[in-house]
């Protein structure tokens, strides 16, 4: 579908326009086309096959099927995950480790009336399964804000032996049973008043913050029937924030302290959402239709993953944000990327603490 010729403005031209908008944080259709026009002598060598009119780009985003851009984003995600497959995790595990969460993009109900409103507000949810080896999205889904987080589990092809780390918004007993059936492991934070019956008490390391480590059966009206198997309940005291957290897992072999550290790794997905919202265009949209919004989000994800691929393949020591800044200023230059990035080793983030960037990637 994407290769079919569409007059003088191809899907490839459309993709380049949208990536240009993401990498240079353009604000509107007019902003995009005006800036591209200023590079008219360089467009052909950058891959464009013709000039770009505002109405042409608007019409393409309105009418062309967004699934083409989704497929491209998923393909780049697959490539990037392969590159980062041996990336260290920070925990002593050889299996895959994934964090699952969603972020809400607020929209104006008057402009985006096609999104069902909740409490008088419109919005979208970006459901994400993040591969923590490299912090590359593995699965992404765009829904309206009303869709419950736990329903995202139904879309997943679970990998046997891998760990899936979730917050308590994903607690749904019957869906958690899917992980056990697939020989995959979950680590999920639970509610304090979850009904359960204690089957066995395990020794715990108080020095590591472990308050209790128990084998239990869920006994709630829906949880007991939804997950009828024994499960492990771990209480962990976080001394940094002075709070006690309760984790549920179907893995009975890992050290309890390691389970707590696994849950702590879930913070990486929060940093991922923060990064794309700060540095890419997914909070303000250049089109109001569902198709235009989807295209913009998928090209934002593609831009993020392409930067991650460049960073890994070139072995660039610079942060993701530093690379993004360098690319935004040199998109139409002929200087090779390794040369551009070679002097960026000492670049530091100006708006996000360096410790956060190092934790992100």
Residue ranges and their predicted role:
Residues 39, 78-79, 282:
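A short structural micro-motif
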Residues 60-85, 89-91:
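Internal glycine-rich, Lys/Arg-flanked active-site/core loops of soluble domains
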